[in-house]
């Protein structure tokens, strides 16, 4: 009996150990990975305009894509992530499969500088003592055989190899990593870290910065504070206003009088999607009051599917992102967006019609009626709705005069709703549905209770929002395909105090 019990205990122990090993090796662990202070940050200059640190083995990303994709799409998802990963390294002149795959560790960092002396520094950790050294030997040997002139010197006690760069067909040298043989420089740190830079000067700046805590990201107070709040993710982001505007191609203004000076953030995998959490440092200014519970209840009272929705103050931060764009002949929507009260703004699904909701059920102000009357639209009651319309002077087939409708408004559940579509307004007032994908993603985002603005979008609207963004276009070029059809949707939340703001975003794929 004792022998049987011992065998049973051994089997249970082996099973538990096997289960633990499988869980520890699962690519799904990347979803809940805790971020730590990367060793590479010591060699990343604090004055770089944009820095990205990946705290994961790039070789595991295709496995993750395979694990979270639907059964029929697993191979395709893995191949797409593999292609995108390889293309990103190729943009820096590196072949992942032949030069990096067999030694690259869990940290890869890129620091970018723009302005008068643009350049970059790439820091790559090695999973063993020989990988980085062997990589550099092969790396420079291949470039030497291709005709590159190499300089081998020492700087701060380290061996530094650099090349002046060569271009075919007589083109001038450039610091772009996409040049055929761009000028490069490298150094090996304690056999554990490879530094590559776009020039010898950039590399020396990184080595100089490593000797002074105030000059490298390891001593950055904003990054230290961010990591001190137990963040999860696979990547860290750090940048300044110039990095936002020139490298990310995004507006760096929180509002007209509050530029964004710095930011720090992290990227976290979430199923077939990615989360961004970021803190934006801006100049001191007046704080925006959070959305009230009653305002946020508008989201739950949305009774029909929409393709885009937001809940914010029309004159609040990043207003162009949250406010609907009015058509040239729309006179009601611009008038509604002149107010200061929070509004739910929605684009109805598969329609050009919009829907506006307010937790204030008061009747329309007299000045709104006057403004519409000046445009020839009179207010009339129709089946319990207030409708602004004017006769066109034309008749339909039944001989009745036709009318053009500017919009209408009505009340349900103590909320006032507006729309430029009578059918859309009636569906909202009488329906019992939900907002569809945008509402579902906002719920999944789980925005903070102190949010000042919320945004949700389906796949098509997300693609339209991302379309003008240069970085999104660049990712599609690297991926070799349009990414818009793969989008399920996005959600975003903003919160704020006097000198900083929090941004939480979720981007999901089908």
Q: Which role does the model predict for each range below?
A:
Residues 314, 326-327, 334-370, 489-509:
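A eukaryote-biased signal for long
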Residues 3-6, 12-157, 239, 245-256, ...:
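Structural boundary/hinge residues at secondary-structure and domain interfaces
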């Amino acid at each position: 009996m004792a022998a049987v019990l011992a065998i049973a205990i051994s089997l249970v122990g082996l099973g538990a150990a096997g289960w633990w090993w499988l869980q520890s090796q699962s690519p799904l662990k990347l979803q809940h990975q805790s971020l730590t202070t990367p060793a590479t940050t010591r060699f990343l200059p604090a004055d770089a305009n944009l820095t990205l640190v990946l705290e994961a083995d790039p070789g595991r990303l295709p496995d993750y894509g395979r694990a979270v994709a639907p059964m029929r799409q697993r191979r395709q998802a893995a191949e797409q992530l593999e292609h995108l990963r390889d293309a990103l390294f190729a943009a820096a002149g590196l072949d992942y499969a032949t030069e990096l795959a067999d030694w690259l560790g869990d940290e890869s960092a890129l620091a970018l500088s723009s302005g008068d002396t643009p350049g970059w520094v790439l820091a790559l950790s090695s999973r063993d003592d020989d990988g980085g050294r062997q990589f550099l030997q092969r790396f420079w040997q291949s470039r030497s055989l291709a005709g590159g002139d190499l300089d081998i010197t020492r700087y701060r006690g380290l061996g530094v190899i650099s090349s002046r760069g060569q271009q075919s067909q007589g083109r001038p040298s450039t610091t772009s990593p996409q040049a055929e043989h761009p000028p490069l420089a490298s150094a090996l740190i304690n056999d554990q870290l490879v530094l590559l830079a776009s020039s010898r000067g950039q590399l020396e700046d990184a080595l100089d910065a490593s000797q002074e805590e105030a000059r490298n990201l390891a001593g950055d107070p904003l990054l230290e504070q961010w990591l001190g709040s137990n963040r999860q993710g696979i990547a860290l982001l750090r940048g300044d206003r110039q990095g936002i505007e020139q490298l990310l191609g995004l507006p760096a203004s929180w509002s007209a009088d509050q530029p964004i000076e710095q930011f720090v953030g992290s990227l976290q995998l979430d199923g077939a999607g990615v989360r961004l959490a970021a803190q934006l440092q801006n100049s001191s200014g007046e704080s925006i009051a959070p959305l009230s519970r009653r305002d946020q209840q508008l989201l739950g009272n949305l009774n029909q599917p929409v393709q885009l929705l937001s809940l914010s103050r029309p004159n609040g931060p990043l207003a162009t992102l949250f406010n609907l764009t009015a058509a040239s002949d729309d006179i009601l929507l611009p008038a509604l967006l002149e107010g200061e009260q929070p509004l739910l703004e929605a684009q109805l699904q598969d329609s050009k019609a919009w829907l506006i909701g307010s937790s204030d059920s008061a009747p329309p102000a007299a000045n709104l009626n006057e403004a519409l009357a000046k445009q020839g639209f009179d207010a009339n009651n129709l089946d319990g709705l207030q409708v602004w319309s004017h006769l066109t002077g034309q008749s339909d087939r039944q001989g009745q005069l036709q009318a053009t409708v500017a919009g209408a408004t009505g009340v349900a559940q103590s909320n006032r709703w507006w729309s430029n579509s009578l059918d859309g307004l009636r569906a909202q007032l009488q329906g019992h549905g939900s907002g569809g994908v945008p509402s579902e993603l906002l719920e999944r985002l789980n925005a903070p209770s102190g949010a000042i603005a919320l945004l949700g979008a389906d796949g098509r609207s997300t693609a339209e929002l991302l379309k003008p963004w240069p970085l999104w276009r660049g990712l599609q070029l690297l991926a070799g395909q349009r990414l818009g059809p793969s989008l399920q949707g996005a959600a975003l939340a903003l919160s704020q105090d006097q000198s900083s703001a929090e941004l939480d975003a979720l981007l999901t794929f089908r």
